[in-house]
Amino acid sequence: MLRVDDLSVRYGKKLVIDHVSAGFKPGRIYGLVAPNGCGKSTLLRAMAGTGNGRAEGAVSVDAGDCMGIEARRRVFYAPGEGTLLYPGLTAADHLKMARGLWASDVDLARVAAECRVDGFGRKRVRSFSQGMKQQLTLAVAYATGARYLLLDEPMNALDPTNVAVQGELIRKAAAEGGCVVLSSHILGNVDELCDTVLFLKDGKLLRYSGEPRSAGELYRKLFG
């Protein structure tokens, strides 16, 4: 399990994440929902140990400290908008680098084919459309073999075909014993994919546990 206990994150004097505690179990898909600027990316980065705010509290991976290299390799944070990628490297370069840094044994040809990046594996990122960058970012996440995938707006810039493809790959990752935490503004995808939906409001995580409702309905109730 990936756990956060009493986690707070500040940027200067601004408290963005306010004493959050939660557990994320393998085999499940979690949705993280909030308006822009409410701290979704900040929380995901803090969970992966890659944030640049001032963090307090604890993050643990499978009951161990998250600071060791082996624990860190079990978690991967994939930011949106292609910011993970290097313009001068090819798609194939990125996949090889991810597998090497995370010491995984993932079949890169399979990942490239599943994520539909095999057709532009030798092209450099600087020539990619935004949708191609997003496809590659997600392929990089799978190439790491990390158990816990933290995906920040993973469906942004994808066309409907690739949204469906990534939905199936996210389900597959969970079915094979992984855990996926995804932030999204596409609330229909949240309803379709996620076992649990968490809302971030005023720095606090809220988990809905009443009768089944759509993420959109709950969003309107919480945020207007």
Residue ranges: model-predicted function:
Residues 183-185:
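H-loop/switch region of ABC-family ATPase nucleotide-binding domains
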Residues 49, 53-71, 207:
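Conserved ABC transporter NBD signature motif
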Residues 96, 105-121:
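Conserved ABC ATPase "signature" region
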Residues 87-101:
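Q-loop/switch helix immediately C-terminal to the Walker
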Residues 2, 17-18:
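Conserved structural motif at the start of ABC-family nucleotide-binding domains
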Residues 33-35:
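The feature captures the beta-strand-to-loop junction immediately N-terminal to the Walker
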Residues 149-153:
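Catalytic Walker B motif of ABC-type/P-loop ATPase nucleotide-binding domains
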